């Protein structure tokens, strides 16, 4: 998110400087807020050897003891992280090493402080229709070569130990290749996890009072576009 923040803001400044209006379109709230709101991140990338050290420590002493270590160093952050969430516990320990509190950074999400004044718009529709479209999208991803894509990445040595390979779609297919499940089961699991992710995204954005919502079951695309353009012109 820190790298995205820097890259996105550089593009925003370039577009504004050329007289263009930047438009963000996407679904991951963290990245949108990182670009548009005031959010501070640790400077630079966290060292791989330090993370590996905490991972080795977790394997050696167990997740409960690792969480106890966090509670000793940063009790406020430990209070908001479940002991079983080892990855987040390690992240909080890394941040503490850099003088940053995970809990305090997390609180930045509750009261947005704008870096740019932006108009936020959200589209929603009947949940069942949305879920069916997600299912169809997953089927299309398979038809367009998702399995071959993952196979090619694994051939390059990019396995499930990488955080990026834990993404929905990659993780399940890797498990299928490793014999944990069939490819058909992987496809259905991707659909289920994608639906759950969409639900979490909606819950995230619903907490942001800045967003003007349009119900696409009650509005036409032309009506939505006209409304949005009117709000932009009036801003």
Residue ranges of model-derived segments:
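Phosphate/pyrophosphate-binding catalytic cores of soluble transferases and nucleic-acid-acting enzymes
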Residues: 1-235
């Amino acid at each position: 998110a820190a790298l995205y923040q820097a890259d996105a803001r550089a593009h925003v400044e370039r577009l504004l400087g050329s007289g263009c209006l930047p438009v963000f379109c996407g679904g991951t709230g963290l990245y949108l807020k990182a670009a548009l709101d005031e959010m501070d991140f640790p400077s630079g990338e966290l060292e791989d050897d330090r993370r590996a050290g905490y991972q080795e420590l977790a394997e050696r002493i167990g997740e409960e003891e690792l969480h106890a270590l966090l509670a000793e160093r940063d009790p406020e952050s430990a209070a908001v992280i479940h002991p079983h969430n080892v990855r987040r516990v390690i992240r909080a320990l890394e941040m503490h090493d850099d003088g940053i509190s995970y809990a305090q950074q997390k609180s930045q999400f509750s009261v947005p402080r704008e870096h740019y004044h932006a108009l936020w718009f959200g589209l929603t529709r009947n949940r069942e229709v949305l879920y069916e479209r997600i299912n169809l999208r997953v089927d299309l991803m398979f038809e367009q070569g998702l399995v071959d894509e993952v196979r090619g990445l694994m051939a390059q040595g990019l396995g499930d130990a990488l955080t990026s390979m834990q993404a929905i779609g990659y993780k399940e297919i890797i498990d299928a290749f490793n014999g944990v499940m069939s490819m058909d089961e992987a496809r259905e699991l991707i659909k289920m996890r994608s639906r759950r992710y969409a639900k979490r995204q909606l819950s995230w954005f619903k907490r942001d009072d800045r967003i003007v919502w349009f119900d696409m079951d009650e509005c036409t695309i032309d009506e939505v576009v006209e409304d949005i353009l009117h709000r932009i012109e009036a801003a």
